[in-house]
């Protein structure tokens, strides 16, 4: 199919009248949608210069069926009386142009929704760990975004190791980077909780300032070790390319896999929190810390493990983010605010709320950006979230229980 598509694209520019019958046969026989659209456009290009209005009319109708962006350009030129003298052909061109615009609009909307879901999956991975730590400890961890960044740099280091010591298996380095990034960021998160945060419980302003300072230290450490410039993390072949859904819509493989990976992490997190003893203890401490301690739950150890879990999930998000964006020292700063918005909007400590809020914010951002711009879109979304929180402070999904600290 790739070879046929390349040949069809070449024919769009270099097809000759002698190839007209062959093109008509190929258009009738072709089953692949992308190749069929390209061949149809090549055929229409030949027919549009025919002296017969009937042939040109058939070409105009064929262009309307393709839904290709190039067809839109060709049809717009035909609306000029100086280009097309036959009024019947011009009228058909108007109809076909409206048909093409409608198909292109559908492709753009689907593309925006898909981009929003893709962005939402990254926000979900970033906010999932934050929902656990913020819900359990009530700690505003401003260094959480740097866990994303550390996960991305762990992926970069794993890639370098594969390039040096196992170049034949370089295609599998992201699979190895996942546990490495989780382990590294989880250990850093647990160390952070044991050395700094556990001394600041109940003092939110001091915790915020301390974690913000730690985030700056981590950023400077990465700049010293790896440099201030972005590093290159290459996609393996199985994460390159995409699926051609419509002429103006390609769904990249890396984003499709990241969406599936984010949902997989959500399922694993739900199972961990609802089907294991650790999860039971985490939920108990979240709902009533003092009562859980009276029942023998080691709250200090649970705090440390939950913080490590949340940081590890953020590290997994960094692995995913390294496959679709630039990896640099300031990577985490771009996602920390949106992560907090997801947690607050979804409801503290609620997985279902985090999933709903992450995908909702992602789709809203991508739909509003082309309409009013990225900055105004962010402002509008923030204003709507503030209004929503005023009416429903507990978020979309609230913890249910008789006593909540």
Walk through the language-model features, giving the residues of each:
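Alpha-helical transmembrane segments within multi-pass membrane transporters and channels
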Residues: 168-215, 221, 356-361, 392-393
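Helix-loop-helix "hairpin" substructures at the membrane interface of multi-pass membrane proteins
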Residues: 250-327, 356
